Amino acid sequence: MLQRLEVIDFLRGFSIFTIVLMHLLQSYPIPPFLMAASSFGGAGVHVFILCSGFGLYLSYLNKPLTYSQFLKRRFLKVYLPYIIIILVSALIPFYNTSSDKLLQILSHIFLFKMFFNDLENSFGGQMWFVSTIIQFYLIWPFLLKLFNKSIGVIYALLISMLWATIVAMLGKSDVRVWNSFFLQYLWEFVLGMYLAKCYKLNSEIVNLLNFKILVPV
C-alpha cells in the first residue's frame, strides 16, 4: 500500500516539474513543434488537482479535522509561504513596475485577485493556480457534503460540465478568472477524493484479511 502513496507523491512532483518546464520553455523563442510539445505540461495541473483531492480526503479519513483546524493547516502549508513569495517578489524593483503594486499585493493577501482579471496575473501568471487551489480549501465543508452523496462524483462532473458550457457560451473560455475557477476542476478534485476512499477501503480490507489469517496462526 505504501507504494501507491509513493506513486501519488511522484505524480505530484512530476506534475509540478512539467508545469515549471512549460512556463520556462514558453518564455523563450523556441521552434513551433517544441512550443506545441511544451503545452502538454498543462496536463500537470489536472494531475496535481486530482492528487490534491486524493491527499486531502485520505488525510481526512485518517484524522478528521474541524473546518477551523483544516484552514489553519492549509494556512501554514500553503497560504503563508505563498504570501511570503509575493512580498519578496514585491521587493524586487524590476520584477513588478506597476503603479498599482500595493493594490496587487493586497489582492493576493486578501484573496480577491482571483476574481479580477487585471489582478490575476500580478507577480506572475502562474500564480493563478494558487488561487484555484485555495478556492477548494475555502469550500472544503461543501466538498465533503457533496462527496457524501451516493453519486457525488457524478454531481461534480455535471457541475464542471455546466460551468464549462456557461463559460464557452459567454465567450470567456480564454479569460483566466473564468476558465480557472474551481468549478472547472471540481470533478477532478472530487475524483481524487473518490480514489482516496477506494484506497482507504482496500487498505482496511487487506488489514482485516491479514488479521484473520495471522491471528489463528
List the predicted regions and their residue ranges.
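Solvent-exposed interhelical
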Residues: I134-M161, A196-L214
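N-terminal membrane topogenic signal
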Residues: M1-F14, K149-G152
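Interfacial loop-to-helix transition and helix-capping segments at the boundaries
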Residues: F33-V45, D118-T132, L170-L191, V217
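Aromatic-anchored segments of alpha-helical transmembrane domains
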Residues: F17-L24, L111-F116, L158-K172, L214-V217
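Hydrophobic alpha-helical transmembrane segments of polytopic
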Residues: I8-T18, S38, V45, Y82-I85, ...
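Structural signal for the C-terminal ends of transmembrane alpha-helices
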Residues: L56-P64, I92-Y95, F142-K149, L170, ...
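Transmembrane alpha-helical segments and their boundary/interface "anchor" motifs
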Residues: S39-I49, L58-P93, S99-F112, I134-F136, ...
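Hydrophobic residues within membrane-embedded alpha-helical segments of Major Facilitator Superfamily
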Residues: L11, T18-L21, V47-I49, F136-L138, ...
